[in-house]
Structures are given as C-alpha cells and as structure tokens.
Design a protein with these regions (language model features):
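Short polybasic/polar patches that bind polyanions
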Residues: 58, 90, 101, 119, ...
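Core nucleotide-handling region used for phosphoryl-transfer chemistry
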Residues: 61, 93, 264
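Short, non-transmembrane cytosolic segments of multipass membrane proteins
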Residues: 7, 12-17, 85-121, 290-324
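Low-polarity contexts
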Residues: 18-48, 53, 79, 123-316, ...
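Helix-turn-helix DNA-binding elements, focusing on the entry/boundary residues of the two helices
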Residues: 64, 96, 267
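N-terminal anchoring/assembly modules that precede and organize ATP-driven motor systems
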Residues: 1-88
Length: 396
C-alpha cells in the first residue's frame, strides 16, 4: 500500500537535491548539539507524539517526506530543527532509517532498527504505530514508579529539613545553656551531638562537598564496566527496592525484545539492542551470553536458564514460544505480566517505606532529645539534692 513506500521512492531527482547539498556545504559540516543550551534534540515524550502522528499521516496516504514537513511545521525549537534535518537527508537520497541514525541523541538504536526493518518489509506505518505503542508503555511504566516514589521522596526531604533545623538552631541553644551553667562532664552522646551540630553550622560547605563528591564518584563508577556491574548487582538485591528494580528490568527486556522481533528485526540484532537498552549490567551480561550462544545455533530458553539471571516463569514461557513459533506473543505476555507485578511491587514498596521512614525519624529525634535532656536532668537532680541538703542544715 501507500504506507509501504520507502523514502528512496519519494526522494527527488539529483537535480533538485543539488541546491540542498550546496546549502549544506555552505553552512559548514560541523553540527554542534548542546542540549543544555537548547540544542537540536527531540525529547522522549515529544518523540512518542511525533511517531504516533507520523504513523497516522503515512497511513492516510501522505508520502513520508511530506508527512515529515507537516510535522516540522507543527513543532518548535529542537524538534523542528531535527525533523528539518531528517527531511533534508531524505531529499538528498538517504533512507529514512539512515537519516534517523545521524541523530542518535534524538532517535535511539531501537527506533532506527525498527524503522529499518519496516522499510525492508514494506510496513513502515505498522512499525511506527508499534514504536509509538512501545514508547507509550515504557513512559507509563516509568511514570508509575516516579509517582509512587514521589511521596517517600517528599517525606525524606521534610525529614532532612526538620533534622537540619534541630541541629542548626535547637542544639546550639542547648549548648549555650550547658556553657552558661558550667556543666562539667557531658554524656558521650551529647558531646557527639554538639560536635555534629557545630560541623553543620560552621562547616556546612564540607558536608556539601562530601555529598557532591559522592555523586561524582557514583557517576564515575557507573562509567566503569566492572564497578557498574557491582552496583547493578547490589541494586537487584536491595531491601524493598530490589524487587521493583528487577521486575522493571525484566518487563523492559521482554517488551523491547518482543517489539523488535514483531517488527522484523533479526534476532541477533534484537538481542544486541536489548542488551544496550536494558539498563542493568548483570542482565546485559546475561543477554550478551545468550546472543553469543544463539549465534552458535543454540536455543534462547536453554541459555537463559543457564545464566540464572531470569526467573523460571520467563524462561518457561520463552521455551513454549520457541516450540510453538510464537515467541513474540509469549514475550508480550511476559511483559504484560511483569508490568502488572511492577504495580504490585511498587505498592508493597511504598506501604513498607512509609512506616520505616517514620520509625527512622522517631529514632533520630529520640536520640537528639535524650542527648539534650540527659545533662538537664543531671543538673536538676544536683540542684534538688543541694536544696535538700541546705534545707536540712537550716533545721538543725
């Protein structure tokens, strides 16, 4: 049908593409993309909308190049610039997938691979619709986790605010009282509390620098393959958070793999893309092992089972998919099942986090109160003892 027309079929003749080529040469070959300065980039949410609209326009019979120009006119900023450049590449004879591949910051590997498969199979419209659906589900999953984490995050921020106020304002007041009353031996907990309070009040820059240093160290560690593997392994085993992280990764793996296979992307290339986008080095290593073994002719489910990185339900369902020739459908079912499990895991996580955070706040505040009032109780007891002795002496 019309939707199956490839970009090369819609590309103008060489005569019409020459001015565009000259214009490109005149503008210079350097393309600086600085997203933080508002550079040319399409955000994920906007890309989903553009993909859905592009599928609709192509499905309505509009040629690809014209559809891109229609979308370009509807957009502003970085998205309009990228769409304009993609259209320009197609005008010069490039395939749609080739044009997209030149803008990796806007179009991820999975996007380019699926478009390429759609071009080869003459089903660009259906592939774009599938891509849009995939991105919508991915965004929905991320949104659920973010919204679930919003309340605990607010509670943590409030806790930090309360504790900072106590340490910076309340503790120094008590410290002055102790000094004015010339309290001698303070309990060890009180001394520790006063030292922390002075550090926060007088050398707050050291605390900020320490936190900043930890963030940088974490960023650097995630760039090194070995340390990233260790960090990702710890993430999967984290108390409360671990189940949510592992289920989210399995859901992403299954959904991405299913979408790629359904779109006609070759199995080895699909595994490569899934490995690069899964977001966890432990699972990525397992997928890499699967890819290497599949290249040698082995079945996927057997290798998955041997890696130990995937739950038995996943490997069994994929085994059934291999036997029946419907692995894409089975992967979709795995993704649906695990996305539902993510919802349950997130609900369990938030219900557990709330009381834990309250208990933690109570313990810290309790420690502060006891540390501050122990010297006062000691002073009160010594004063009452002194008053009693004085009263006894007066009676004699």
């Amino acid at each position: 049908g019309k939707s199956a027309a490839t970009p090369k079929q819609q590309a103008p003749s060489k005569q019409t593409s020459k001015p565009a080529a000259k214009k490109k040469a005149a503008s210079g070959g350097i393309n600086i993309n600085l997203p933080f300065l508002g550079g040319s980039k399409i955000k994920q949410k906007e890309l989903t909308i553009i993909t859905r609209q592009l599928a609709t326009l192509i499905g309505s019979g509009l040629p690809l190049l014209r559809a891109l120009k229609v979308l370009e006119q509807q957009r502003k900023g970085g998205a309009a610039k990228v769409l304009s450049k993609v259209a320009s590449e197609i005008e010069q004879g490039a395939l749609f997938s080739e044009a997209l591949a030149k803008f990796p910051s806007s179009f991820p590997k999975i996007y380019v691979a699926m478009v390429k498969a759609g071009e080869a199979g003459g089903a660009l419209e259906s592939v774009l619709s599938r891509l849009a659906e995939f991105m919508e589900k991915e965004a929905k999953l991320k949104g659920k986790i973010k919204s679930a984490m919003a309340y605990p995050a607010v509670v943590v921020v409030v806790m930090i605010g309360i504790l900072t106020f106590i340490m910076v304002k309340i503790v120094p007041t008590f410290t002055k009282i102790f000094e004015d009353m010339e309290v001698g031996d303070l309990p060890a907990t009180t001394v520790l509390l006063i030292k922390i309070s002075k550090l926060m009040a007088e050398r707050s820059y050291l605390i900020v620098a320490f936190i900043f240093g930890l963030v940088i160290l974490y960023r650097v560690a995630t760039k090194i393959k070995f340390t990233k593997y260790l960090i990702d392994k710890v993430k999967l085993r984290l108390f409360i958070f671990g189940p949510v992280i592992s289920k989210t990764i399995i859901a992403r793996f299954a959904r991405t793999f299913a979408t790629l296979i359904t779109s006609g992307v070759p199995i080895l290339q699909s595994l490569q893309i899934v490995r690069d986008t899964v977001g966890n080095e432990v699972i990525a290593n397992a997928i890499n092992e699967i890819r290497n073994r599949v290249r040698e002719g082995e079945g996927i489910s057997g290798i998955m089972l041997r890696t130990g990185a995937f739950p038995p339900m996943v490997t069994n369902m994929i085994a059934v998919g291999e036997e029946t020739g419907a692995m894409d459908a089975m992967l979709e079912k795995v993704a649906d099942a695990y996305e539902a499990e993510v919802d349950a895991a997130v609900a369990a996580m938030t219900s557990m986090l709330e009381p834990i955070l309250i208990v933690c706040l109570g313990v810290v505040v309790g420690f502060i109160v006891i540390s501050l009032f122990m010297p006062l109780i000691k002073i009160a007891l010594s004063l009452s003892g002194g008053a009693g002795e004085g009263g006894g002496g007066g009676g004699e």
